[in-house]
Amino acid sequence: MRVIFTCGGTAGHVNPALALAGLMRQRDPQTAVLFVGTPDGMERELVAKAGYDYAAVEVDSFRRSMRPEAMRHNLHAAGALARSGPAAKAILREFRPDLVVGTGGYASFPMVKAAARAHIPTAVHESNSVPGLTTRMLEEYADVIMVGFEDCRQHYRHPERIMVTGTPVRGDFFEKTPLEARQNLAFDDGRPVVVSFWGSLGASHMNEAMLDMFEKERENGFPFHHVHAVGKSGWETMETALRQRELALCPDLDVRQYIYNMATVMRAADLVICRAGASTISELTALGMPAIMVPSPYVTNNHQEKNARILE
């Protein structure tokens, strides 16, 4: 079987696709897999680390604003979207997939649309409790719409196409025991482990709050190990702040731009402090992990708070 997974924008769109690809390869090692995303999105890096082939289609998001800079950006995005159709068709001709699966993010739109028009079976997965703009637009093209939450079903016009599947979690989350994960990270002194992150892109205000938390941890003699992911957008600012506050060399504080070995780090944790993206929630619930969630207020339709409240 030959399968294209198309996704992008944030790790929350990429990780479910990686989980599905891993499961398909496990069931049939001969499955040919191609990921399609944007040329410079973080999906390219995550897919490469997972060992899959990758192709790029130039496409960009649309900004919901009438400000001049947003309108200029949207003009560029409209041009990229128009060019993405022929590029998607070329990838389909070359790879000849039996199935195209979109897992969200604007990068998935041209591939799923082109596949549907070429009469190639298509599926879309929406992890969040409220569908994003891309998956709403793809409803007319997808043969099957998989959703992570039952609550999401009501937002679609074609209930006969909906399958409530949950959000898949990568198999490597279950490969180690908590003890093995801690030993892998050299956290073997019996102290608890706290893991915190604000999504793959980061959150400047929350990272500032974490700096104050780090200082309080130091004042109390670091009663636990702390692994924190800053995110792509705030890394340089955080590096400078850590040096200024003399926190950069603290052995019990592991601050990174991104947690690439999330399966090991989360498995080692006693507590996770995080946003409420659907993929993260699925990983936490699969592991039975205690968590403090701070939903992002800047997402479409406030879907992160709705994701988190489903767990109440």
Where are the regions a protein language model picked out?
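Active-site-proximal region of nucleotide-activated glycan assembly enzymes
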Residues: 34, 42, 53, 116-179
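Catalytic binding pocket for nucleotide-activated donors in carbohydrate/polymer assembly enzymes
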Residues: 281, 286-312
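Structural loop-to-beta junction motif characteristic of Rossmann-like glycosyltransferase folds
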Residues: 52, 120-121, 270-271, 288-296
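Short amphipathic alpha-helix
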Residues: 13-24
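Conserved nucleotide-sugar phosphate-binding/catalytic loop shared by glycosyltransferases and other
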Residues: 3-10, 30-83, 232-234
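Donor-nucleotide binding loops and adjacent catalytic segments primarily
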Residues: 46, 50, 178-183, 187-272, ...
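Acidic donor-binding loop of glycosyltransferase active sites
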Residues: 97-99, 259, 263, 267-281, ...
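Glycosyltransferases and closely related glycan-assembly transferases
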Residues: 87-100, 107-123, 136, 140
